[in-house]
Amino acid sequence: KNVSLINLDRCFDFLPEAWQCVKCHEMTDQVLLKSAKELDKTFQWLEKSNFEPQFMPIIDNDEQALDFVLDTARYYRYPAVELVFKDDSHRMISSEVIDRFHAMGIKVWINSLTLNFPLCGYHDDICSLFDDPNKGWGWLCDHGADVIQTDFVRELNEYLDQRY
């Protein structure tokens, strides 16, 4: 308590129960709620909630979700957005969109975990560790990532220390 950030990630199906649990432990100010599913319904729930958790939308290869987040960012202050993209050509990773998020004070969070499907256009941990970190983590930095989620924190920190 008062030390950690609670990441409620993709929990829309049981969000009221999860939120009640956090309230019982008086830790509502430590929550970051992340969701890609039904952003409009999540947003409606947030508006009705007595408490306002920090909400970070996950935009998962979805133009409609991207536009929804860009539109609602005018009146709901997102601390960050998580961008999930299959390849480099997706509009969400364009400098125009990234610059727009940054101009609104919204951090860009990119997940570089390696799964069975691309989360960041294959600029992931495997690319960074076994090919060239400049093509992985470096590419993400060059394209505006403020936060890189990784399972290889030490290696990423070493790369960033070397780079900067």
Which stretches of residues belong to each language-model region?
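C-terminal active-site rim and adjoining tail of enzyme catalytic domains
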Residues: 56-164
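Metal-dependent phosphodiesterase/phospholipase catalytic core, i.e.
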Residues: 1-64, 83, 104
